[in-house]
Amino acid sequence: DFNGSIWNALEEAVQAIGRREEIYIVTGVTFNKGNENKEIKYVKPKKDASQKCPIPNYFYKVVLRVKHSGNTVTDARAIGFWFEHKAYGTKAKDFENYTETVDKIEEWTGFDFFINLPDKLEAAAESASPNWSEFKNW
């Protein structure tokens, strides 16, 4: 089960950081990765089978940590996670194997995250090596 395993483990790990400092998180879904044209599956409600709801093919989460001097952001680090919507079994901690740069997730989704950061900090944070151990210990 996707939500009860790998996604839940990721959310708990991110929340652990958020309990001790300010972080910014963007979570979303998408049906295609970049320009691909993947089949979209639907679920129909039991009460009205004429209706249907699309099931996302991918889930992503991008997380930003910042350091301040007063009200000025002096440094930033970001990491992204990208998952195909499927069962991941009991290897919940394996979320560390699904990291991506935020730049890559922006490319795949068409979104521009963290636009309020100074450009130089945004560019460095979004292109940083997507290593979970480095990110959580930064």
Put a short name on every predicted segment.
Residues 2-138:
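Domain-level detector of nuclease and nuclease-like folds
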